Amino acid sequence: MLETLRGNKLHSGTSKGANKKLNELLESSDNLPSASSELGSIQVSINELRRRVFQLRSKNKASKDYTKAHYLLANSGLSFEDVDAFIKDLQTNQFLEPNPPKIIESEELEFYIRTKKEENILMSIEQLLNGATKDFDNFINHNLNLDWAQHKNEVMKNFGILIQDKKTVDHKKSISSLDPKLPSWGNKGNNILNSNESRLNVNENNILREKFENYARIVFQFNNSRQANGNFDIANEFISILSSANGTRNAQLLESWKILESMKSKDINIVEVGKQYLEQQFLQYTDNLYKKNMNEGLATNVNKIKSFIDTKLKKADKSWKISNLTVINGVPIWALIFYLLRAGLIKEALQVLVENKANIKKVEQSFLTYFKAYASSKDHGLPVEYSTKLHTEYNQHIKSSLDGDPYRLAVYKLIGRCDLSRKNIPAVTLSIEDWLWMHLMLIKEKDAENDPVYERYSLEDFQNIIISYGPSRFSNYYLQTLLLSGLYGLAIDYTYTFSEMDAVHLAIGLASLKLFKIDSSTRLTKKPKRDIRFANILANYTKSFRYSDPRVAVEYLVLITLNEGPTDVELCHEALRELVLETKEFTVLLGKIGRDGARIPGVIEERQPLLHVRDEKEFLHTITEQAARRADEDGRIYDSILLYQLAEEYDIVITLVNSLLSDTLSASDLDQPLVGPDDNSETNPVLLARRMASIYFDNAGISRQIHVKNKEICMLLLNISSIRELYFNKQWQETLSQMELLDLLPFSDELSARKKAQDFSNLDDNIVKNIPNLLIITLSCISNMIHILNESKYQSSTKGQQIDSLKNVARQCMIYAGMIQYRMPRETYSTLINIDVSL
């Protein structure tokens, strides 16, 4: 009734007040809770509704005594008379369906049972179809490994389309936020290649691709040199490439490689290497400056330093920028000594002191003795006696001098390692390089136990200062600072912020010098060590090109063994195994088998000398067998066959070939040729099986490794393929003759048919698959031969005998087929019956 009222609430009534009240009543009824408001909807068929309506109609009619309803309506302000008048005026006839014809209860029950049965059948069929669909999808996902999203990403990456990885970190954030204790590259789990730390795409543009190829060429040459035990200057190669590049970043990288170049062929001592590099760099700078401002006199190192002092410490009016310099004969003597030390020219500095001894102040006369001891010492240290005297003079006269020469203060500080609480002299250190050199000069790694704390200053103290300052204090010299101070791990970390490709190759350069171990050995055991993980750096880098350039990926992964530790070697082997399984580039990576059966090595085998493998054969066998199993599980039969060949598992190879050939023979159309004009042994199962049989079975060494049963099955299947070719060429008589020689079907009598039927269960599955086709071929040949004989105009006594003999063979085959019909496809037996009837 409410629905009827709702449909007609806009119609006119006897009064506007009644309409308004009824509309409000309808709207409020929608908000009333009911006993079934939280129950789900029930979907029933039309027939079920009819049945239930019929049951309801058969019950006693409800009483129509609604005398108390008007009290409820009156309390709500609704006049019962108005409602009654409105309801009477409703034209309900047009909304009511005619009464359905009366249905007899017995007929309704029978109708319900029948329809219910049909619904159950349809529901069962639908459930079976849904189950089959789910099973098929599960089979596809499990056996074919069709991860479409992954394949889509791989294809996009191969074509150079950059994909934003949700798991990658933002390498472009400020380097000042780097935590020096925590950087870690790659996943620490077992999966080396898929740590998802790399955002680099070497195929993003032509410039990046060209840079990638140039760097890869250097790595290839480096590996060739390693394999030949030759000497390859990898740093010089990168210097030659970066020398022609422009930009601030490239300038940093160029000088970084020059720092690495200075480390080769040396016993790596971070402090000494840093000092020597900075001294050579400064001397080269003064030489270039001297050539631009040629003065009178010989181009000696002393004259070059004097020229530098004139350029840097004099104003335009030739007056000194620092007023309190000690100038002797027009030369600031202490500045000259300082910059000679800055250039590593200790002998020249001593010579200058000796020549100017008479002009030095009385309080400074003893310094010449100290300096001689300093110059003659191997580690440039002073004896305890001299050190004590120098410290006394420094504290009493030099340090407290308000108008003293700052270069004299610097020289005293450097020679005696004085006042280490104030290591820097701003008036003297004109550049970051000067600041670095000053600190390196003051470092003393082997502090005596009785040395006071304020006189101790180690490399680690210096490294902590650099880390605390961060890149903002060093402008565009931060990378060089990290390398010169031995913070190689943080240097790689910092390079990642602006160029992942250069960071990786800088890591390669450091690894070639065995510098990773030095970096970790200079850390206190109390502090967490930086986890660089050279293996993961290289593995992450190969992410964007391991599919497009698997050969190049191998060249980088074999670099993991540069550190030569047992863990590094193991990681290298694991990374190569993952590369083979992931890229599936088996021919490129593992090799292939030539047409003559000879093994053609892949790139991994070519690089075996760099892999530090104990048993080369076992290593390749392990990788190949794992890849073969993966290919077999994924249903990639051709890859699996190739890999098992490389693993020299010849019996498994023949097993797979038998399965492939059997499937081809049983599933292919009998009216189509098995071998096409463009087929070859790499794509056609029949040609593949023939080549394998000719290579393996004729080789006594290989043949002994293959089970006799496998060889017999292979030969049987090859004979079936030959029969198929005869059948396709319509050579009916020859086909039957070869079929009889095959001895799989009964050709004599009923006893033979029964025996063959009993032996059917003992046949190999690869043969069982082909029995239905063999029966069809046999009966088709018999049918065609009988037809030819019947059409022949030649009449002889043997003609009838031939037909009877052929029909007898057909009869035995039908008896045999009848005994095994439930183990064959239904359509096969129907086809055989049709052929037999036509005979």
Swiss-Prot record:
Descriptive protein name: Nucleoporin NIC96
GO biological process, one term: nucleocytoplasmic transport
Lineage: Eukaryota, Fungi, Dikarya, Ascomycota, Saccharomycotina
Pfam family, one: Nic96
Miscellaneous comment text of the record: Present with 15500 molecules/cell in log phase SD medium.
Subunit structure: Component of the nuclear pore complex (NPC). NPC constitutes the exclusive means of nucleocytoplasmic transport. NPCs allow the passive diffusion of ions and small molecules and the active, nuclear transport receptor-mediated bidirectional transport of macromolecules such as proteins, RNAs, ribonucleoparticles (RNPs), and ribosomal subunits across the nuclear envelope. Due to its 8-fold rotational symmetry, all subunits are present with 8 copies or multiples thereof.
Cellular compartment(s): Nucleus, Nuclear pore complex; Nucleus membrane
Gene source species: Saccharomyces cerevisiae (strain ATCC 204508 / S288c)
Alphabetical keyword list: Membrane, mRNA transport, Nuclear pore complex, Nucleus, Protein transport, Translocation, Transport
